[in-house]
């Protein structure tokens, strides 16, 4: 069984895409973020033979997130953990326990991601235990694993910096 997890945040003014605030109002940022999330979910929904999940922060108890799960027939769960690394580890471990053998996780920051990148990640998991999608800014847009996640990879990670990719590869 395969699972695709998309990490999303509840679209609350002042809580999403905060680095855009000097340029856009909090309400405009929320609308932009909703568009990002809707676009990426719409693309992911085209994948066949993959169960799709929304990993929601801080909770899935949000009208927009409920609407997405209903419209696109997704399953959802609340992210668990103190930082992004713990949230990623917990999402993978919980879904491996449910019987999933191949899991790919993406964020909602890349609405223009070609869906072929996600398909390619699943293909690479047939021969590899772990895959990543590197960003040009030194971060990651995708993490995939087969059968287990190596939690040490995500511990003491300097999230939201240009060092994530380098530290992941070490």
What is each residue range found by the language model?
Residues 149-170:
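Active-site oxyanion/phosphate-handling segment shared across diverse enzymes
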Residues 104-106:
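Short aromatic-hydrophobic micro-motifs that form the base-stacking/packing surface
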Residues 1-19:
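N-terminal nucleotide-binding beta1-loop-alpha1 segment
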Residues 49-58:
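Short beta-strand/loop segment that forms part of the nucleotide-sugar
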């Amino acid at each position: 069984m395969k699972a695709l997890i998309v990490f999303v945040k509840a679209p609350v003014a002042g809580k999403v895409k905060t680095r855009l605030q000097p340029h856009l109002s909090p309400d405009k940022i929320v609308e932009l973020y909703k568009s990002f999330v809707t676009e990426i979910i719409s693309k992911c929904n085209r994948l066949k033979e993959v169960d799709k999940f929304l990993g929601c922060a801080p909770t899935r108890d949000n009208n927009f997130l409920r609407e997405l799960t209903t419209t696109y027939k997704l399953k959802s769960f609340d992210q668990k953990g103190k930082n992004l690394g713990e949230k990623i580890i917990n999402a993978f471990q919980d879904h491996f326990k449910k019987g999933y053998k191949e899991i790919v996780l993406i964020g909602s920051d890349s609405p223009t991601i070609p869906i072929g990148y996600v398909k390619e990640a699943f293909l690479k998991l047939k021969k590899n235990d772990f895959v990543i999608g590197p960003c040009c800014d030194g971060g990651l847009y995708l993490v995939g694993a087969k059968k287990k996640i190596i939690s040490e990879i995500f511990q003491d990670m300097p999230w939201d910096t240009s060092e994530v990719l380098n530290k992941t590869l070490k």
